[in-house]
Structure formats: C-alpha cells, structure tokens
Amino acid sequence: RHDNLDRTLPELLAAPNLRCAAVYTHFATADDPGHPLFDLQLERFASARAALASRGVTAASVHAANSAALLRDPGTWFDAVRPGLLLYGLAPAALAGVLALRPALSLRSRVVAVKNIRQGESVGYSARYVADSPRRIATVPAGYADGLDTRLGGRGEVLVNGRRVPIVGAVSMDMLAIDASSGPVYAGDEVVLLGEQGGDRITVAEMASRIGSIQYEVLCRLGSRIERRYNRP
C-alpha cells in the first residue's frame, strides 16, 4: 500500500536476493474520464517513485499506461506502455473518438443449411423462438463453444450478403440460427459476426452492448478452436 512505503521499502531493499527491475501501476479508472481516482492514483505512483529515488533506487523501467491512459494522458507514458484493446484497433468506449482506429480483427463463418419453417414452428433449445409467420431459417456453425455469448440469441445480429440478419432462438454449443427471410441466403454464403460487409459493420462494442457486457469480455471469450488467419494490411 502507498501509505506503508516508509515501513515496507527498507525491508524490501535490505533483502539481498531482490533488485528493483521495474516500477509500475495499473489504473482502476482510466476508462472513466470523470473519475477523480485516476489523478489520485497517478499522484500516489509519483510519490512511490520519489520514495525509491530518495533511497538511491533507480528502476530500469517505469510503466503505467493501459490503452485508456495512453489515449487520455501523455503524463502516464513514462518509458513503456501496455496497450491491450488498441492492439486490435479498438478503443475504450468512453474514448472511442480520440484516435482514428481501424479494427484489426473480424469473425466470420458460413451458412451450412437453410430451411423453411411454418408459422408456429420453433427453433433451437427450449423452443425459445416460435415463428409468427412462415420464415426462412439459416444455420451457422458457430456457438458458445467458440465464445459467442448465449445472450445473443434474440438480441444479436450478423451480416449476410451486406444485410443485417437477426439471430433467433438459443445460441447452442456449436451452432446458431438466423432469420434469413428478408432476402436471398444460401448454404455457403459468408456470415460476418464481427467485422464489415457491404458497407455495414458489426463492432465489438455493439456486440458487447447487446449482451450488457464490455469489449474485453467479448474478445477474451473467442475460443482456441476458431481458425485464425493473419493477413497483411
């Protein structure tokens, strides 16, 4: 703790098997521009560094800035920064307009089947979706085992042939269903769950908002069985 430095520093510095390789902090409220704790934490970090310097300790590296701090305050940059979201071309929601960014990732699949269902027929586990009229339902091989949140069922959308198409019914382990009644959709058509198609875009922030979560959780959920393809810009 910052208020225990006078007691703990002498004990740490007296240990023969320890050396100060780096000094760092991690901001609790960097993505909340109106929160006073950000400035207070930066002041306490400066006091801790001064306490070390007064005892002749010079750290090889000083770092504090995550993506949000990097965008809002150059005084946090020191000699290293720790961007997370920014590496993916994303920014914390409250700071989205500070820097022009282009998302560096997309999540895509393909339609594997298309079926016509009658009014009153259901789709998926627990029959959560019941058609109120004849509908055309497409199956996409992506589910919660890939990291898609189950709350996207009935809330989320995907892009197919440049159009937004709603996710219907429950998101299952390996598949989800979309209502493809608004236009032609066929097996093999590309489905964009995150990314751009036909001038429209499904963003990580949008997906997070639809499930009442945050961008970080959406990204961290994406599982290892998703095939990664790396493209040069």
Predicted feature residues:
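Active-site loop/helix belt of alpha/beta enzymes
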Residues: 1-118
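C-terminal accessory subdomain/extension
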Residues: 116-233
